[in-house]
Amino acid sequence: MKKIIFAALTAAAIGTASAATYKVDEYHANARFAIDHFNTSTNVGGFYGLTGSVDFDQAKRTGKIDITIPVANLQSGSQHFTDHLKSADIFDAAKYPNIRFVSTKFNFNGKKLLSVDGNLTMHGKTAPVKLKAEKFNCYQSPMAKTEVCGGDFSTTIDRTKWGVNYLVDAGMTKTVRIDIQIEAAKQ
């Protein structure tokens, strides 16, 4: 009896620890930003309908994330502000329709994911960023009927590294906080 239980537990552990590919669920993925507006208020907006994939090997504590953020899906709560954000002044959606993040390394402390290093491409320029994992988990989804992995990630960037310089000379901050929520279903 003990051998049967041990064999079943071993098989279950191998099944959950194997490498897998996950498809980003565009309905459970967004990237939001916040930028100080001349020390008076905070301007916010978000991108929705993110697409991409996550390769994750929980046992080896390795993975790769490749996410595309469509600039056309930007929303701010004000159509006038959204249109300005999409203009050549800021994101230049006509020339640069997508923002992309590709990971280079997953950083763990034991079994806990701490952060993901990677490259962010925006405005035709690529620079390294570190996404801090606020939380990360994998679970068996009762809705998707498969394993889903996801979490909340954050970083702060200097937007001028990507050539987004609007109003910097007038005193507006260079730093932008980015918060990303993502879930991806096992394929």
Put a short name on every predicted segment.
Residues 18-187:
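Low-complexity, acidic/polar, glycine-enriched regions of mature
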